[in-house]
Amino acid sequence: MTTGPTTPIARLRDVSKVFDPKGAAVTALSGVSLDIAPAKLTAVMGPSGSGKSTLMHVLAGLDRPTSGTVHLGDEEITKLRDDDLTALRRRRIGFVFQAFNLVPTLTVKENIRLPFELDDRRPKADERAWISTVVHRLGLEDRLKHRPNELSGGQQQRTAIARALATRPDILFADEPTGNLDAKSGREVMAIMSEAVRDFGQSIVLVTHDPIVAAHADRVIFIADGTPATELNDSISPEAIASTMLDIDERADSAVSR
C-alpha cells in the first residue's frame, strides 16, 4: 500500500447504508464523507442507534454500503469480490471486540498466530520477531501456554490485541474493547492501544460509549442520525467529550419536540 504523510489510511465518500428489514427501510448512514488519518487513534461516539457501529463495519469491509465508496489506502474496497474482501480483511485489517472472541481450545500463542493459520501459512522470521515484540510489550510472555479460561479478562483482551497486531495491519478496528473489563483492566488496555499508535505507528479506529476511553484518542468523531455531527481534535478530555455528547442529545430532544 502506498500512503504519503497526509494520505488517509481509510476514507469514505458519500456513503449511505440503508437496512430494509421486512420492507421497513432504516437509514443507518446518510451521505457520509470522512478521512481517517494514519498512525492516529480515532474514537467514534454517538447515541445508541446513531450509526457508529455501522460506520465501523463499513470502514472495515464487514458490511457493504448501499451507495458511495470506501477506500483502504489507495484501494477501493467497495469494488472487491467477497473472497477478495475476506483476504484483505485477514491480511490488512485487525479487529478487537468487546467479547474477546478467543478460541477456547487454543493456547494464547495459538490464538495470537491464528490469522496466519487462517491464511494457510506460517509466519516468516521477521513476522515471528514482530510477534515476540508484541507479546513482550503486552506482558504475555508467561501466559503463552495458557488457554483463555485460565486468563483474567484483561489478559484475554491483551491476547486479542496481540492477535490483531500480529499481522501488522494497516488499520485496527476496536468495538467497545473495554466494555467487559473492570476499570483497572480498561485503563491498561487503552494504555496499550495508545502505545501501539505512538510506538508502532498503528492506525486505530475505536467505537465506544465511554468518555474516559475516548479521551485517549487523537480525534473524537461524534455520529448522530447516521452522519458526523461534530468532532474534537484539541483539548480532548472526558469532560469535553461528555459535554459534547450532552449537546448532541439535547439537540436531538429539541428536534423531536418540535
Q: Residue spans of the language-model regions?
A:
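Catalytic Walker B motif of ABC-type/P-loop ATPase nucleotide-binding domains
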Residues: L172-D175
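Helix-to-loop junction immediately C-terminal to a conserved catalytic motif
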Residues: A60
